[in-house]
Curated annotation (Swiss-Prot):
The gene is TAC3. Residues 102-126 are annotated as: Disordered. This is Tachykinin-3. Belongs to the tachykinin family. The keyword Signal applies. The modification Methionine amide is found at M95. One of its GO terms (cellular component) is extracellular region. Residues 1-20 form the signal peptide. The keyword Secreted applies.
Amino acid sequence: MRSTLLFAVILALSSARSLGAVCEESQEQVVPGGGHSKKDSNLYQLPPSLLRRLYDSRVVSLDGLLKMLSKASVGPKESPLPQKRDMHDFFVGLMGKRNLQPDTPVDINQENIPSFGTFKYPPSVE
């Protein structure tokens, strides 16, 4: 949901900038006499009522977008514990069983763990 909203914001901003660049470019067109005409520059200025109607007719208004963003950021926050638990489950799936009581120390019997120096080959290999 947030990525879609972010994409919509970026798209709206980029289209607004590109439209602004086109408008600036059209205002800078040179009159064949060699200079800018004041009458021509007035043609590119739109009346405020028309601009207001264009702004209101857009699919996503800036106010609506800001309201949606504020609602998304104010929404109930989930604790990070479920995500941590999911990641733990993922790594446990890769590595082995989960320890049900993480606070109790696990006694490791050193006799059951072979070290690298005590590895013996079976008699059939010799």
